[in-house]
Amino acid sequence: MTASYLPSILVPLVGILLPAVTMASLFLYIERDEIL
């Protein structure tokens, strides 16, 4: 199976990228809200 290595790459990637994107969008939302 060629896709057997995919989860071992995808899981850490999602585990790192998802919180990073969530924190970044939340930070920008708070900053923009305070400026206005």
Swiss-Prot record:
Protein's cellular compartments: Plastid, Chloroplast thylakoid membrane
Membrane topology: Single-pass membrane protein
GO cellular component: chloroplast thylakoid membrane; photosystem I
Protein's job: May help in the organization of the PsaL subunit.
Protein name in UniProt: Photosystem I reaction center subunit VIII
A Pfam entry, by short name: PSI_8
Gene name, Swiss-Prot/TrEMBL: psaI
Keywords from the UniProt entry: Chloroplast, Membrane, Photosynthesis, Photosystem I, Plastid, Thylakoid, Transmembrane, Transmembrane helix
GO BP annotations listed: photosynthesis
Protein family membership: Belongs to the PsaI family.
TM region(s), chain numbering: 7-29
